Curated annotation (Swiss-Prot):
One of its GO terms (cellular component) is plasma membrane. It is a multi-pass membrane protein. This is Vitamin B12 import system permease protein BtuC. InterPro entries: ABC_BtuC-like (IPR037294), ABC_transptr_BtuC (IPR023691), ABC_transptr_permease_BtuC (IPR000522). PANTHER family: FERRIC ENTEROBACTIN TRANSPORT SYSTEM PERMEASE PROTEIN, VITAMIN B12 IMPORT SYSTEM PERMEASE PROTEIN BTUC. The complex is composed of two ATP-binding proteins (BtuD), two transmembrane proteins (BtuC) and a solute-binding protein (BtuF). The gene is btuC. NCBIfam families: PRK03784.1 (NF003001).
Length: 331
């Protein structure tokens, strides 16, 4: 009876958290559409200019931030299970860097292929390559947490060096595009670019539904096989899903770090590590975090706006340092 009550209490806590996050997300979304350089009133009729501002500028940007936030948070939570490392995150371990390098190569050598589909394909290939490299090294070399992080940092440095070299071989327009992808931003996202969202959203939903499978993987390969899990097939599907989400996120908004690290970790600390419940809340909380961060980026400067990646890094870096200190014994 005590166990039943404990389980019921845990379920109620997850439900209350879900309702709270949904309410916060909807409130922030409404605020996002109303505030900016031109503030709008929800209680008065909007002019044609104000309607165009919302439908053509703010709403596509809002949806882009939400999709990227959900994608990175779910990808981060999945990557942590896949690598067996709570400090794994697409930006920290270099997966986002791989996507950015592939896009830089596309912009420099194939500038005529300037379309969301081409950006998506290049970013997914780069993210897939770096994800495969990390998984193979983590499994074959039995890397500890510290060494895996060092490998990820090294991959990030390598991708940063490639992008820096690209600066010197690009014209002014190319340089501006490269800076855009490097620093992360959803400014100027159009409805046409949301073709990428049509790829990301189904993958997010599919990964959210894999929570039970991830819970079995956390028990170890032996137990997972006994429970009927095809380890090889599941791992490849998860790798491809992570690459698709990271690639779509980088193609849509550039390199945005720490979302996939902060969101799953804080949810695990407060609500537990059951992936069946963690993944949907990670998607919701990731969307809430990035929409809020982009709102800060829009309002922080009176004459302009901050890059979204700068805001998320400012918020996430201290938490990452705290996590490193907290996990120093296992490192």
């Amino acid at each position: 009876m005590d166990f039943h009550r404990l389980l019921q209490h845990k379920q109620q806590r997850w439900q209350r958290s879900s309702y709270l996050l949904i309410g916060l997300f909807l409130s922030v979304c409404v605020l996002y559409l109303l505030v900016g350089e031109l503030w709008l009133s929800p209680f008065s009729a909007w002019s044609s200019l104000e309607q165009q501002l919302v439908w053509e500028l703010r709403l596509p940007r809002l949806l882009a931030a939400a999709v990227i936030g959900a994608s990175l948070a779910v990808a981060g939570a999945t990557l942590q299970v896949l690598l067996g490392n709570v400090l794994a995150e697409p930006g920290v371990v270099g997966v986002s860097g791989g996507a950015s390098v592939a896009m830089v190569i596309l912009l420099l050598f194939f500038p005529s292929l300037n379309s969301p589909v081409a950006f998506m394909a290049a970013a997914v290939l780069g993210a897939l390559l770096f994800t495969l490299l990390l998984v193979v090294m983590a499994r074959k070399l039995r890397l500890t947490t510290a060494r895996l992080l060092l490998v990820g940092v090294a991959l990030g440095i390598l991708s940063g060096a490639v992008v820096t070299w690209a600066f010197y071989f690009s014209d002014d327009l190319g340089l501006r595009q490269l800076m855009y992808w490097l620093m992360g931003s959803v400014a100027g996202v159009s409805w046409y670019q949301h073709l990428l969202s049509l790829v990301a959203v189904p993958v997010v939903i599919w990964l959210v539904l894999q929570g039970g499978v991830l819970d079995k993987l956390m028990l170890g390969e032996g137990h997972a096989k006994q429970l009927g899990i095809d380890i090889h097939r599941v791992r490849w599907r998860l790798i491809l899903a992570i690459a698709l989400l990271v690639g779509a996120s980088v193609a849509l908004g550039g390199v945005i770090g720490f979302v996939g690290l902060v969101v799953p970790h804080l949810l695990r600390l407060t609500l537990g590590s059951e992936n069946r419940l963690l993944l949907p809340l990670s998607a919701l909380c990731g969307a809430l975090l990035l929409v809020s961060a982009d709102l800060i980026a829009r309002l922080a400067l009176g004459s302009g706006e901050l890059p979204l990646g700068v805001v998320t890094t400012t918020l996430g870096a201290p938490i990452f340092i705290w996590m490193l200190v907290r996990n120093h014994d296992s490192c």
